[in-house]
Amino acid sequence: PKSATFRTADVVGLDTMCYVANTAYEKCPDDPEKDVFKLPDYINKMVSNKWLGQKSGQGFYKKVDKGIIHSLNLKTLEYEPMNKKRHAAFTLAKEKTYLRDRLNAIVRSDDVAGEFLWKTFSRTLIYSANLAVIIADDVYSIDRAMKWGFGWELGPFEVLDAIGLNYFVDRCKKDGVAVPSWLLDLKSKQISSIYAYLDGKKYFYNLEAKDYTELLYHEKHIDFQIYKSKNNIIDKHWSASLVDLEDGVAAIE
């Protein structure tokens, strides 16, 4: 989401976040990542202080004056002026127009921001891949749930494709991270993406069939990538593309 991690927590409310985290920790005893739901001491302290976020006027952020917002120092629990830092990863991202290209670039940046983002994304994507066969019938249902329910622009497996499946698998192995067998199987088959556009249709990798299956859309749904895969781009510039949707209709993306 555009509000990112801590601002989203403020909007949702730390009391709600804590309830969800505690419930997940207690009700998912066999979850391999259940320990991420253990709340750090500073969050418990914030809740006891009634610093619940937007609903209480302060949380991770606090508006101290008109147009002036301070952020919480997690070590001292005092509000301080925000010190915005410049990172090479952000510079690389700003050079890219599309989110997929930005994601591909930032995880390859060797500065502290790039390393942080790689560790965050890789852990999230490995978790998603490990549980894909348990929590859903197919990968696109997980992607849709994250986009429709949590405001992600791309679902986890779309993010993995954006990063690059081969790069992702190779770097995880280099980092000593166990890679789910089905991702290794994809790489061994020289399949380089979970989603594919072929002959004007979109396909997803079916974990049960171990092959691509066509993704069927509602008749009113428009996927620009399908038309772009058919070379239906009339004109393209750095900020937008004019795409032929056929039937005498064009659209700007």
Question: Predicted segment positions?
Answer:
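N-terminal glycine-rich phosphate-binding loop for ADP-containing cofactors
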Residues: 1-253
